[in-house]
């Protein structure tokens, strides 16, 4: 009987010891919970950023390709669309070689260095200087999509007037000389506009109003002014070939712009939601504003006016999308559409 009691006591003692060893203390459980939450947040941020990158790429092809392709004459549709398509390939190669490094490497004022050339040290580890919850490779590919669409925007200014080979040379040089330094100055660590007066006067460009739209807009204006009108215009009518293509392209641009603006929050956060809402409201108000102005001026609205207004609103709300609430966003969009 005594042996049985001894065995039972030993068994109970061992069980209690094992339970004590397997049950972590509250601090250990809290640490494990925090790690689990951080891992889930990082996974969610990464998923949203990859989705946003795909949405921004869709803005170039097929969005911008269809939008511009529908506005030119029938004989130039494929050539115009091919310009957007080829830039998806050319800019990607340049970005991998030196583009990302010149835009986001180092901390100089005007242009980056070659620390990330050939995508060296760009892997799954986050870069805390830019996005601490997603792999640097995700951030790199997201910024690549911005670099692709920016020169593609300029192509509309010289549609039907520039040879394909000349377009390739121009956009390559433009990317290296204009876009990459501007991206570094506005978004790069230590960039001139990003850290003006020691950061006391920061550059509030949430999603690319300066880097993308001002650079491409000014460059497009200079190109159009330098190259002049299309041969025969305006004596020969040059109406859009297919507004159906342009309509589909504009709709794809509208959807893709959610990745453009809300993705610039660099995570699945409340800021991304705010930018998403501001983007949509701004575009809607701009479309209505343009249509109303056109209706008043011409006596009737048009499809081209509606899609042009929506795109104008999307452009106008881009730099402010992360800073304004829905009704100010609508006001910005309305002004863009009417003006």
Can you say where each PLM-predicted feature lies in the sequence?
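Hydrophobic alpha-helical transmembrane bundles of multi-pass membrane proteins
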Residues: 2-6, 10-13, 18-339
């Amino acid at each position: 009987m005594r042996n049985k009691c001894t065995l039972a006591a030993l068994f109970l003692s061992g069980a209690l010891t094992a339970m004590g060893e397997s049950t972590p203390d509250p601090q250990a459980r809290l640490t494990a919970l925090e790690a689990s939450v951080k891992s889930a947040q990082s996974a969610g941020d990464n998923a949203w950023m990859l989705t946003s990158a795909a949405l921004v790429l869709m803005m170039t092809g097929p969005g911008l390709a269809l939008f511009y392709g529908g506005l030119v004459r029938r004989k130039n549709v494929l050539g115009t669309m091919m310009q957007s398509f080829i830039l998806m390939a050319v800019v990607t190669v340049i970005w991998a070689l030196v583009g990302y490094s010149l835009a986001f490497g180092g901390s100089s004022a005007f242009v980056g260095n070659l620390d990330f050339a050939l995508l060296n040290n760009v892997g799954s580890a986050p870069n805390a200087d830019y996005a601490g919850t997603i792999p640097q490779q995700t951030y790199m590919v997201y910024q690549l999509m911005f670099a692709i669409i920016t020169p593609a925007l300029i192509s509309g200014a010289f549609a039907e007037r520039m040879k394909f080979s000349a377009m390739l040379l121009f956009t390559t040089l433009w990317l290296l000389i204009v876009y990459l330094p501007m991206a570094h100055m506005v978004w790069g660590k230590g960039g001139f506009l990003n850290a003006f007066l020691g950061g006391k006067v920061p550059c509030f460009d949430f999603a690319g109003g300066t880097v993308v739209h001002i650079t491409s807009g000014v460059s497009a204006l200079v190109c159009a002014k330098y190259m002049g009108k299309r041969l025969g215009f305006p004596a020969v009518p040059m109406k859009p070939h297919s507004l159906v293509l342009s309509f589909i392209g504009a709709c794809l641009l509208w959807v893709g712009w959610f990745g453009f603006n809300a993705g610039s929050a660099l995570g699945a956060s409340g800021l991304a939601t705010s930018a998403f809402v501001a983007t949509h409201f701004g575009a809607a108000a701009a479309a209505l504003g343009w249509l109303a102005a056109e209706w008043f001026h011409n006596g009737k609205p048009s499809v081209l006016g509606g899609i042009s207004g929506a795109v104008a609103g999307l452009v106008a709300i881009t730099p402010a999308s992360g800073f304004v609430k829905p009704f100010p966003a609508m006001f910005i969009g309305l002004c863009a559409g009417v003006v």
